[in-house]
Amino acid sequence: MQLTVKALKGKEANIQVSEGDTVLAVKRLVEEKLKVPVSQQRLLFRGKALADEHCLAHYSIGPGSRLNLMVKEQVAPEGHSGGNTAWKSLSVILRKHFSPTDAERVLEYVQKDYERSLSLLSLDDIERLATRILHPQYSEATDLGFLD
């Protein structure tokens, strides 16, 4: 089916998709057509933001539907690049070994997995991790559960 994707500031593209395609797959097509990186895209349908993991049928998007594209500007706050340095370094490494699109996909996956892993840490987990970092001489005992 044909969809029209319209950026809020002008550009428009027609793309060929199926109802079973995910929003992320659509974003990749939009990246090819409109040269907007997936990480900067937010797709809307009838005013509702679309989640990457859902398929188009989930939102009742059919032939001839029109999606709106909001482009998120990626501006780093002045004087604060510490957290982004590792991601930028990883991005450079990935781009040496993968196409730009694949490198972006891998980087997004790693970032999401990292955020998910952090959100699962309990206060006890953080305390054990800090103890291992600050007192490496106790790490063997901690690994064996003697300090728990």
UniProtKB/Swiss-Prot annotation:
| Entry's Gene Ontology BP terms | post-translational protein targeting to endoplasmic reticulum membrane; tail-anchored membrane protein insertion into ER membrane
What Gene3D superfamilies does this protein map onto?
A: Phosphatidylinositol 3-kinase Catalytic Subunit, Chain A, domain 1
Its main localization is: cytoplasm
For this protein, the record's PROSITE patterns field holds: UBIQUITIN_1, UBIQUITIN_2
Q: Name one GO cellular component term.
A: nucleus
Annotated keywords: Cytoplasm, Nucleus, Transport
Specify one Pfam family: ubiquitin
State the source organism's domain of life.
Answer: Eukaryota
Where found in the cell?
Cytoplasm, Cytosol; Nucleus
Q: Which InterPro entries match?
A: Ubiquitin-like_dom (IPR000626), Ubiquitin-like_domsf (IPR029071), Ubiquitin_CS (IPR019954), Ubiquitin_dom (IPR019956), Ubl4_C_TUGS (IPR041421), UBL4A-like (IPR047154), Ubl_UBL4A-like (IPR044724)
Query: Which intervals hold domain Ubiquitin-like?
Result: 1-76
What's the subunit arrangement here? Answer: Component of the bag6/bat3 complex.
What PANTHER family does this protein map onto?
UBIQUITIN-LIKE PROTEIN 4A (PTHR46555:SF1)
**Functional summary from the UniProt entry:** As part of a cytosolic protein quality control complex, the bag6/bat3 complex, maintains misfolded and hydrophobic patches-containing proteins in a soluble state and participates in their proper delivery to the endoplasmic reticulum or alternatively can promote their sorting to the proteasome where they undergo degradation. The bag6/bat3 complex is involved in the post-translational delivery of tail-anchored/type II transmembrane proteins to the endoplasmic reticulum membrane.
Task: List the protein's name.
Answer: Ubiquitin-like protein 4A
Q: Which organism is it from?
A: Xenopus tropicalis (Western clawed frog)
